[in-house]
Amino acid sequence: MRKLGGGHLVITDHNSTPQLMMEGFKYESLKPLLEQQDYITGVSFEKTPKNIDYNVCGFRKYWGTGTIIEMQAKELGIEPCIDKWLQIKPDLNLQGKIVCCRSTRYRNELFPWREIIDKIRDRIVFIGVHDEYGEFTRAFGKVDRFLTNNCLDIAQAIAGSDMFIGNQSSPFWMAAGLHHPLIQETCIETPDSIVRYKGANYFIDGINPLELIK
């Protein structure tokens, strides 16, 4: 959207799959973060959008042909752009911390979470919903949790931290949009959330996360 000159962003539901629907909580959580961006003049939800200049809903027909950014660029007929697209004030309370998250989808069981937690447990701050946090602590032991109200809170926490570690979840995309240092637990079956910039590291590339954590 930034590459196309910005403007008013209209969000809608592209299908009726419950976990994919944006209306309600997901939209209300995302809206404050979007409204902070200088290239977005407004944000709204519409069930049946009209008078749209660029419609990106059809990008899924390119599934399997590249990253999500590349697929969306194909749908819009433009070259992929991975320039920093998020700008927010960092939460300075997270200085020295490493923000992590792990959603229930897009996992890689070879990723050394236990070793990472054992090494930096006192610096880890988990961001995620109750079920994700509960599952994470049952698997890897107790870590601190940072409670957030919306995506703006999450992005500010990530921006204020030393690093983000997580899988292909919405917090990853916030870290990538900020060009924040990160390590991704890349899903082998669906490695479509790759954004190449200095400081972004992907497990699928054969990296050793333990060597990257300072």
Q: Locations of the language-model features?
A:
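Catalytic machinery of carbohydrate-active enzymes
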Residues: 1-214
